[in-house]
């Protein structure tokens, strides 16, 4: 904490011995040690609190950026869904070309390829041998 060498501590001790006196020096040293220990613990606690706050702040920033990402993703999904719904609502139902010719001529249309028409007729289902 402080950069005090051993010789400087000796000088401080001698000055304290002369100023305070030998009777009160042990009690003053104990009190000074007690307050010095409390100050160290207080400083360590403040350091821990600051580190926790910095970590919490970085976690809050991360959480906020994640919320922004999720919100933007949801907005893009909703906009795409709305576009699809608008497209589905505005497009008319497609009418097959053969049916549209039949409607225009007012009659039935004959299949162009009779062989294809014959092959498209369903066959009779097989009956099981009972």
Swiss-Prot record:
InterPro entries: TatA/B/E, TatB. Residues 80-89, 96-111 have a biased composition (Basic and acidic residues). Residues 70-130 are annotated as: Disordered. It comes from the Bacteria. GO terms for cellular component: TAT protein transport complex. GO terms for molecular function: protein transmembrane transporter activity. Its main location: membrane. Gene3D superfamilies: 1.20.5.3310. Pfam families: TatA_B_E (PF02416). It is found in: Cell inner membrane. Keywords: Cell inner membrane, Cell membrane, Membrane, Protein transport, Translocation, Transmembrane, Transmembrane helix, Transport. The chain crosses the membrane at residues 1-21. It is a single-pass membrane protein. The keyword Plastid does not apply. One of its GO terms (biological process) is protein transport by the Tat complex. HAMAP family: TatB. The Tat system comprises two distinct complexes: a TatABC complex, containing multiple copies of TatA, TatB and TatC subunits, and a separate TatA complex, containing only TatA subunits. Substrates initially bind to the TatABC complex, which probably triggers association of the separate TatA complex to form the active translocon. Belongs to the TatB family. Part of the twin-arginine translocation (Tat) system that transports large folded proteins containing a characteristic twin-arginine motif in their signal peptide across membranes. Together with TatC, TatB is part of a receptor directly interacting with Tat signal peptides. TatB may form an oligomeric binding site that transiently accommodates folded Tat precursor proteins before their translocation. This is Sec-independent protein translocase protein TatB. It comes from Nitrosomonas eutropha (strain DSM 101675 / C91 / Nm57). The lineage of its organism: Bacteria, Pseudomonadati, Pseudomonadota, Betaproteobacteria, Nitrosomonadales.
């Amino acid at each position: 904490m402080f950069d005090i060498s051993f010789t400087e501590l000796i000088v401080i001790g001698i000055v304290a011995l002369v100023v305070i006196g030998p009777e009160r020096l042990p009690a003053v040293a104990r009190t000074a040690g007690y307050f010095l220990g409390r100050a160290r613990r207080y400083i360590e606690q403040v350091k821990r609190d600051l580190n926790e706050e910095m970590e919490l702040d970085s976690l809050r920033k991360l959480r906020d950026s994640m919320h922004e990402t999720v919100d933007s993703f949801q907005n893009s999904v909703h906009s795409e869904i709305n576009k699809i719904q608008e497209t589905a609502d505005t497009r008319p139902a497609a009418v097959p070309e053969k049916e549209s010719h039949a409607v225009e001529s007012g009659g039935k249309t004959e299949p162009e390829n009779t062989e294809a028409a014959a092959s498209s007729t369903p066959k009779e289902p097989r009956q099981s041998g009972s």
